[in-house]
């Protein structure tokens, strides 16, 4: 059997730090970000289905979110201001991401490729799937800003404002529900969120 470096590469996502140009109270890596995005995307899909008549596969959405930044193990995490400095850079970076995604897919053993390719190649996402993952991605970045600001790090003030505009642009009923039900707790301390459920 031929060896594959696929999971050895993915395990290195934990070595890639997000928000590299900003001072962080707590450094966040791509691996932990991907897990949080997967959990939030799954929640958004479940909320959409249960509350707003949606019909999406919440488990698939979670998997797509888990792999949504996988190509960064080959490209690194390009800071947002650089990535979107102008449309030409954004377009070129998309092309680089596509190449990196294909390179990852090519690492998967051929007999498993049809399982992993649709998770890694974002062109295999439906518009609805892409929208839910993007909403979750933006929500998690926003939550990171809240955490940094709560720790007294005003470096994230402008990022929070920018992300509020992004969330407004991607707004949906399921996002509104998530923001109303789950996000307020991120403003509280551990003691405050533990009050109602003592161990």
Swiss-Prot record:
UniProt site positions, description: Appears to be important in orienting the phosphate for catalysis: 18
InterPro entries: HD/PDEase_dom, HD_domain, YfbR, YfbR/HDDC2
Keyword Cell inner membrane included in the entry's annotation: no
Catalytic activity: a 2'-deoxyribonucleoside 5'-phosphate + H2O = a 2'-deoxyribonucleoside + phosphate
Pfam families reported for this sequence: YfbR-like (PF12917)
Xref: PROSITE patterns: HD
Keyword presence, Iron-sulfur: no
Gene Ontology cellular-component annotations: cytoplasm
Self-association and partners: Homodimer.
Name this polypeptide is given: 5'-deoxynucleotidase YfbR
Biological classification of the source: Bacteria, Pseudomonadati, Pseudomonadota, Gammaproteobacteria, Enterobacterales
Designated gene of the protein: yfbR
